[in-house]
Amino acid sequence: MEPILNQGYGYGFALGLGAAFALLMAIITKVLTACMGQTQNSERFSTASRSVKSGLISSSTVSAWTWPATLLSSGAWSYTYGIMGGFMYGVGGTIQITLFLFLAIQIKKKAPAAHTVSECFFIRFGKLGHCVYLFYCISTNVLVSSLLLLGGSQGFSSTTGMNTVAACFLLPLGVMVYTTLGGLKATFISDWIHTVMIYIILIVTCYTVYCSSSLIGSPAKMYDMLKEVQEVYPATGGQSYLSFKNSEMMYLTWSVMIGGLSSVFGDPGYSQRAIASDAKSVFQGYLMGGLCWWIIPMALGSSAGLACRALLLNPASVTYPNVLSSVEISSGLPVIYGMASIFGKSGAAAGLVMLFMSITSATSAELIAFSSVTTYDIFRAYINPAANGKQLVRTAHLSVIGFSLFIGALSVGFNYAGVTAGWLLTFLGIILTPEVSAVTLCLFWNKMTRFSLVVGAPFGTITGVVCWLASTYSFCDGIVNKDTVMTSKACFVGNIVSMASSPLYIVLLSYIWPDKETFDLNQFRNITVGDDIDTTELNAIVSQLKDERILKLQTYWSIGINLFILIGCYVIIPTALLGSNHDLSKSSFSGLIIVCLIWILVAAIYIILFPLWQGRKSLANVISHIIRLKAPENILLDGLTPKQSSEDVGDATSFHMDKLDKEKEKSSELKTA
């Protein structure tokens, strides 16, 4: 079948929108420098001064987690499995974010001066343990980045006929430019802009499908149409598009959820957001980010994805009178075709805009994360420990440029090898899930040893891969190849074994060969900052040390929330509906859709307006300086001037740490008395 759009759309979006965003972020970076005195030093480039508020953290979390797979796979799942597809995709992704929230709080609490999580491994386990974790960390970074470009380039190629090789190199081009110019702060701002555009398109799509479209126009009409199409084109496994009774879908969603944990816990892009956030904002930022993200795959799948299925018997369908081929489904085209059926070619173009936004926003997070790891965990740790701020910034810039070219080339290789985004996502989870337990135990368990990390994590990977291939051999009558290893049951076995075996190995080895002395977790505070840190950034680090009581309370809240979402929303509700063996009633289906329509509006209002409200003073300051052409005012802390040396900055940090320790000792003495 011919692409629904011509190549001009593909090249126009990749080059035109990419150049527009690069220019916009260059202007914003210039304005921040001129109006707020935010020069691009090493700390600001990698950590955004550790002062980002919860609103931007939420929008950035939504942006970073809205992969091309979020948009395309949620629609494909809904098209294939019905209403449960978008729901299960959304809940599975949300639990990954809320679980990471628990870890993010510990990063702020125990390593306030960290630039990357892997720095904690260097402090605790030395060079050998650090290198082992770096392998997992960088592998996650590389594979996730390739996954983003692979899914995006294949989506662009299928929709417009654009050359896949050209897409792999042109899509990250604009991202590379504005990330190099603006660093992490520019990434946060661009993430907000990307997310705003995605929400606007999504709201228009959902409300048109269920409220005003002449083809569907109401949840009740969608319900009836799905009933009709079920008679002609039954759902996978002979089940209904209006029920949750599909065991294959359950295996698939659990496999993707478990495997996806590695792309959250191990991907330095997510920890960068925790490091960049204000200590009081990390809880609200990640929690609201997860809740606002859930509605994107749910709403898109239940609108465009279900519309593509429901309209198969209508001449408005792009593929009428045929169903979509397996290639079209695996390419994620149900979303594009569904929007095209409702809006015409403008709908397909809008879907392509959403796809472009998801590619560039998530890729920018990966670029800045890789640059931070390269700068602080490789260059400063092994090549030049005495590197000054300018050298760190230069290394970060070169890392962004080099990594952009590398992942473009790697994505081309994957494409020619016949690897799809879904295949790569499953493979990534099975080989890299052991890093979930490694980073969790590193931050929480003081008895974990270097030997257990060096041996336990790789053994977890080996065990997972062996069980994955053995399960494929068993479930597929002895046939093991690139296609059969994607069997949902085999993927589930590989992911669950890889995740569960690693902590077992680490704990057992730590008890069998323990260290002479247990590790003091307070040593994570020994991580040093760059010599070009200014007083605003120092202020942020010191304030984190003072917020420890708040972070402790948020830890308990995060445990409760994760238990509710994991057990209630991800286990009890789906299994209860699975066991009911009935379709949703028309009123239940309509009620679920109405909840989605309300949720998407509330999420959009929060993501779009709340960051503007939190940043109103900064916006007013920028506007005031532009109008009056005033010179920027520098913020001072405890009498320190912005040009003081790094020794003075370090002394100030140590002073505040010592002061806090004395206050804790005094408090404990009073409690004892």
UniProtKB/Swiss-Prot annotation:
Belongs to the sodium:solute symporter (SSF) (TC 2.A.21) family. This is Probable urea active transporter 2. It comes from Schizosaccharomyces pombe (strain 972 / ATCC 24843). One of its GO terms (biological process) is urea transport. It comes from the Eukaryota. Gene3D superfamilies: Sodium/glucose cotransporter (1.20.1730.10). GO terms for molecular function: putrescine transmembrane transporter activity; spermidine transmembrane transporter activity; urea transmembrane transporter activity. Involved in active transport of urea. GO terms for cellular component: endoplasmic reticulum; endoplasmic reticulum membrane; plasma membrane. Keywords: Endoplasmic reticulum, Membrane, Transmembrane, Transmembrane helix, Transport. PROSITE patterns: NA_SOLUT_SYMP_3. Coiled coil: none annotated. It is found in: Endoplasmic reticulum membrane. It is a multi-pass membrane protein. Disulfide bonds: none annotated. The chain crosses the membrane at residues 8-28, 83-103, 132-152, 164-184, 196-218, 249-269, 287-307, 336-356, 391-411, 424-446, 451-471, 492-512, 559-579, 592-612.
